[in-house]
Every structure is written in structure tokens, then in C-alpha cells.
Curated annotation (Swiss-Prot):
Source organism of the structure: Prochlorococcus marinus (strain MIT 9313)
One GO-annotated biological process of the protein: ribosomal small subunit biogenesis
Binding positions (GTP): T138, K139, R140, D141, G190, P191, S192, G193, V194, G195, K196, T197, S198
The protein's name in its UniProt record: Small ribosomal subunit biogenesis GTPase RsgA
Assembly behavior: Monomer. Associates with 30S ribosomal subunit, binds 16S rRNA.
């Protein structure tokens, strides 16, 4: 029997399709299977899977990025059943992706123009995940070298090491691919229209992801990615394209806002405030230098969060996007 030829095998959920899961196997040796008639190259094998009802009974949801065990494998039809889910090492809510090791925030230098408020919202959402955050500036070819250097210096002041890329000229793509090759699962996020999908098409030429134009009236991109799917960048490294949103949510916890700003978090390590519940406005004993660029944004976000807290105790959950 086909199921008897293969034991339970480990894999990662790389896509969801209606009621099915697409699982990429970690290891696969086709030469050991009498019934195998497919390719024997080194490409990872993907199986279309259903899930055991016992997972539902245990309340074990299965999402993209989950490491799972598949069984009852039909090699000829490339189908199987997900029997178990491994504990997650990390989790982001929106979109739901498990075991992320890095978040890549993509922001355009132009078309649409760079917006510090919007950029900060995406960066705060990325910082909440607790994994490495990489900042990428797209459409580098639309501004001069001097303008780019000013933007890079500015973002270094925010506490990041930004990289600039252009899908038109190819500049920076090699360096970005090298950076991503050292992380197991990187999620791309950012406003729609900044070129995330175009960037992935350049990094992964075998893909043909649909690219949308930027809206002329709003100067915002039209969403082209409708679901989350993982793509293999190189051996041991996957990347995800995610649906774009123009206004991600702020974190729900007022007291965690400050540490999500790297330039403010660094100040608190060196010059802690007198009181633990300091919000770094006009409180006595505050050790924060308020001359940093994003301080007005921090105060604005804090006021917005306070209004939301007053209007709805508990608020809505925070997520990546």
C-alpha cells in the first residue's frame, strides 16, 4: 500500500487552498519509492493535504509556516493527511504566519512617497513580533544619490540599517538576497504599491506574481496579493508575500509602545526613568531626551491609543499588518 511505503514525514505548510493545506516536505528520497513516477531532481516535494479531525477536537489550528507531520501519503496523487502540528517558535496575527524569523518592511522612496507616520506604523507592527526587523527602501532609481543618502541617514537615526533596492536596475538585489538567505522564514510587509510583489519576482524569477499599478488619485498601490504563500529563496530559506494594507494597527498595550521605537528603547537602557509607568511626556524624573525626530509621532500614537482604550476597554488585538 502507498501509505505503508512511507512513514510519517515532517514538512512545512507553505499555502492554504480552501480546505486544503499545501505542505513542503523537509526530506524526500524518491528513489526509495517503487511507486514514484515523478521527477528525481533536488526540488522539494509539495503535497496537497487534508487534516485529521483530531486536530479540530484539540483546537489545533494549522497555518502557513507551521511545521507539521504528514501521514497516509499517496505518492502518485501527491496527497496526504496532516496528523500533528509542532509547537510554534513565533507567531504573527495578521496575516497569520507561524515560525517567522524575520520581518522585512518594504517602503518606497517615491510613488508612493515616503510617509514617516505610515512607515512608523509598519515598523511598530514588525517590532511587536519579537523577531529581526529589516527595513528595505524600494524604487531607489526614482531619486538621486544625494536624496537617497539623506533618507538612509535619517532611517539610521530611527535605529535601523536600511537597504535600498531597485527592481528596474537590479541595484541592491544581490545584497538583499544574501541577507535573507541567513533567515529561515522572512515575511514581507508594507503598504501596497511599494513594490513588494515586484521585488519577490526579481528575487525568485521562477515566480509570476501579479503586479498592480499605483492608484492615480490616492497614490496608493492596488492590492495584488490576496493570500499568504511561502516561496523558497534558497536551501533552508523561505520568504512570504502578504496582503498589503495602507494603515496597520497600533499595539494595544500603552506601556509597550516606547520599546517598539529602537531609538527610544536605547535611551531607556542608558538613562532609565524614575518611575516605571513613565510615558515620557511631562512626568517627573523622565530620562528621555525629547529631541529625536520621531518623538512627535510617538506622542501622537500614544494619544491615539489612549483614545482607543477609553472608548473600548481591551481594544483589538495587534498584528503584523
Amino acid at each position: 500500500m502507498a501509505a505503508a511505503e512511507a512513514p510519517r514525514l515532517a514538512g512545512m505548510v507553505v499555502a492554504l487552498q480552501a480546505n486544503f493545506l499545501e505542505v513542503e516536505l523537509e526530506t524526500f528520497n524518491p528513489s526509495s519509492l517503487v511507486s514514484w513516477t515523478g521527477s528525481t531532481d533536488d526540488e522539494p516535494l509539495r503535497l496537497l493535504c487534508t487534516r485529521r479531525t483530531r486536530l479540530d477536537h484539540r483546537g489545533a489550528a494549522v497555518h502557513v509556516g507551521d511545521r507539521v507531520w504528514v501521514e497516509a501519503i499517496d505518492w502518485q496523487e501527491r496527497r496526504a493527511v496532516v496528523g500533528d502540528v509542532e509547537p510554534r517558535q513565533s507567531w504573527i496575527n495578521r496575516p497569520p504566519v507561524a515560525n517567522v524569523t524575520a520581518v522585512v518592511v518594504a517602503l518606497a522612496v517615491k510613488q508612493p512617497c515616503f510617509d514617516a507616520d505610515q512607515a512608523s506604523r509598519f515598523l511598530l507592527s514588525a517590532e511587536q513580533t519579537g523577531v529581526d526587523v529589516h527595513l528595505i527602501l524600494t524604487k531607489r532609481d526614482l531619486i538621486t544619490s544625494d536624496q537617497l543618502e539623506q533618507q538612509l541617514v535619517r532611517l539610521r537615526g530611527w535605529g535601523y540599517r536600511p537597504m535600498a533596492v531597485s527592481v528596474q536596475t537590479g541595484e541592491g538585489l544581490g545584497a538583499l538576497k544574501n541577507k535573507l538567505s541567513s533567515t529561515r522564514l522572512a515575511v514581507f510587509c508594507g503598504p501596497s504599491g511599494v513594490g513588494k510583489t515586484s521585488l519577490l519576482n526579481q528575487l525568485l524569477p521562477q515566480l509570476s506574481l501579479r503586479v498592480g499599478a499605483v492608484s492615480g488619485r490616492l497614490k496608493r498601490g492596488r492590492h495584488t496579493t490576496r493570500h499568504v504563500e511561502l516561496f523558497r529563496l534558497c536551501e533552508g530559506s523561505l520568504v512570504a508575500d502578504t496582503p498589503g494594507f495602507n494603515r496597520p494597527e497600533l499595539p494595544a498595550d500603552l506601556r509597550k509602545l516606547a520599546v517598539l521605537f529602537p531609538e527610544l528603547d536605547g535611551q531607556l537602557e542608558d538613562y532609565p526613568c524614575r518611575f516605571r509607568d513613565c510615558f515620557h511626556r511631562d512626568e517627573p524624573g523622565c530620562g528621555v531626551d525629547k529631541s529625536w525626530e520621531r518623538y512627535p509621532i510617538y506622542k501622537r500614537f500614544l494619544e491615539e491609543m489612549e483614545c482607543l482604550t477609553r472608548s473600548s476597554r481591551g481594544g483589538s488585538g495587534s498584528g503584523l499588518l
